[in-house]
Amino acid sequence: MVMFIERGIRGGLSQCSHRHAQANNKYMESYDPSKPSSYLMYYDVNNLYGWAMCQPLPYAEFRWVNDISNFDVNAIALDSSKGYVLEVDLEYPQHLHDAHADLPFCPARDKPPGKRQDKLLATLYDKKRYVIHYRNLQQCTRYGLRIIKVHRVLEFAQSPWLRDYIELNTRFRAAAKNDFEKNLYKLMNNAVFGKTMKNVRNHVDVKLLTKWNGRYGAEAMIAKPNFHSRSIFSENLIAIEMRELEVKFNKPIYVGMCILDISKVYLYEFHHEYMLPSYRDKCKVLYMDTDSLIYHIECEDVYETLKHDIARFDTSDYASNNVYGIPLANKKVPVLMKDENNGAIMTEFVGLRAKMYALKVDGKKVTKKVKGVKTNVIARTITFDDYIQCLEGHIEMTRDQSRIQLLHPEDSKVPRFHRKNIKLRNKKR
């Protein structure tokens, strides 16, 4: 049962669906009326995991359902006292592929072409033995995916037992007067989620020893069958890492798995139930991360639509005298979308891959992101044009990054500079 839940744990989805886009609208100085009016919008969900933690979550009475031949997942209420996680085979019908190309349902871990490491990929392939929460499965079937076979069903008792705690911290955060308080109450929620996701398989046993001989000396530890590795810090100090002899599964990973799955429900709902019906084929996802979406939208005035559907958005950080006439509303309300630019016009976006993109916003510095690279290196050595060159020329650029790190401590007691070569590249399609 534990391994069944582990197979259903999939983190936040991060992908770059379209590589480059430019806005062209009446709020820009470079507006060209001869071209279609278009906007670049960067939406972020307020407290997505906080909202998911307020939903009914498992807490007891776990059991396998014996008779699954007549099991109807669509008959289960969202607030049912019983919840389910299913292992199913899913078919992704061909006629849905074009409509779902920007944001396919049911992301799965797999190796991208030419890569060795598994990544979370949103694909249009059929799914085999896919472990999924019943709410996500209900959403998938509503949008046309077909259940071919149900292999197993795990039943559990559920209730919104975390809701009061999460809502209390949310109220405190909305009333916070400074960034410290805002971050504190955000952490109070996120820390709970982090504990539900703790992987005890990764725990290590490290011993710091100062002697060679004896029952608890370095010699005895190295001779044990569960010895893993050692690092010598000095003549009289050594660290020895031992493999765990037993693993105690005492973390509620079933809660974390359900939170991750339920959180994806809202992002898919926003895209497929709101954005696509509102803009149809004039709207496409450029980039998405765990709780954010960057869109390219062709319309006359996206802010008029936002104003009309303000119940879906948090506009509390807009300027009080903004040119769009949008009222300030819904401050920090969970699971509402927020315009990350707060009305400032995003003029251009370029994305090379997940966690590697850049964007221009009128009146602000260029935003440049490269995962794993220090902020000062990005600011000093990488420009927006570098992203464009990598994209259009299919070239690879490199930069040097230095940090102080203790390398091979058995050879040297003194930390020294470590120079790492980082790459800015675009994968050919």
Show which residues each predicted segment covers.
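Conserved acidic
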Residues: 1-429
